[in-house]
Regions:
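Structural preference for beta-strand elements that scaffold enzyme active sites
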Residues: 2-6, 46, 74-78, 98-101, ...
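Conserved anion-binding
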Residues: 12, 19-23, 90, 97-171
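Conserved, mostly hydrophobic/aromatic
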Residues: 8, 39, 47, 92, ...
Length: 237
């Protein structure tokens, strides 16, 4: 089980949202590079970066900060938020992150196949955000009829190896992950599945680690509110 501390960026600051709502924003730090180095020292396997400005507005204000984070840490980084065309994917990869996460556009017919052919499936992950099992897009503002399981199968068929699955109802709420949904997804697709949303403490991570097929977990608000041990690796020992 790999640990992915999350750094959500808005206007160059580290923030957390509740259920993805920009109005429910908490600013945790004005120094994202220091935060990334702190999580690396704590035992992060990856750093999970989200460009919220790009996600909500389609335009990034954080690329220089992201580039600085990647340069400052030795663990790999991944970047999500606003990956809606080839140019934005190229700009994201130009920050030297290991891979970018395609969310909204993954549900558009043909887009994933194009991105995979252009950039290679190893440089891409698919972020599937779900409300009651249905795919949510455009910063979680719209919900589609497409189910999360259907989209996951399509992505794997194209050659995508990493899927990040977020249950929106639990995200940022510190009430525990949706284990049932995570089990369903892990059983449905053969890929590196990363669970996201709702982790409230070490016990949630230990429970996710018992689910076959879950490769990693993204930890957000619980980290910033002191609910995790200083040594993150000790959770799984």
């Amino acid at each position: 089980m790999l640990l992915y501390p999350a750094i959500d960026l808005m206007d160059g600051q580290v923030v957390r949202l509740q259920r993805g709502e920009a109005a429910k924003k908490t600013i945790y730090s004005t120094d994202p590079v220091a935060i990334a180095k702190h999580w690396e020292a704590a035992g992060a396997d990856w750093i999970h970066l989200v460009d919220l400005d790009a996600a909500f507005e389609g335009k990034s204000r954080n690329l220089e900060v992201i580039r600085a984070i990647v340069a400052a840490v030795s663990v790999p980084c991944e970047l999500g938020g606003g990956m809606r065309d080839a140019a934005s994917i190229e700009a994201g990869l130009a920050t030297c992150v290991r891979r970018v996460i395609i969310g909204t556009k993954a549900a558009e017919p043909g887009f994933l196949a194009m991105a995979s052919a252009t950039f290679g499936p190893d440089r891409l992950a698919v972020g599937i955000d779900a409300k009651e099992g249905k795919v949510a897009v455009k910063g979680w503002i719209e919900t589609m009829e497409l189910t999360a399981l259907e989209l996951a199968r399509e992505a794997v068929d194209i050659g995508i190896r990493t899927i990040i699955y977020t249950d929106i109802a639990t995200d940022g709420m510190l009430q525990g992950p949706n284990i049932v949904a995570m089990r369903e997804m892990a059983a449905a697709v053969q890929c590196d599945l990363i669970a996201s949303g709702g982790v409230s403490g070490p016990d949630d991570i230990r429970e996710l680690a018992t689910v076959p097929g879950i490769h990693g977990v993204i930890i957000g608000r619980a980290l910033y509110e002191g609910r995790m041990p200083e040594n993150l690796r000790s959770i799984l020992e």
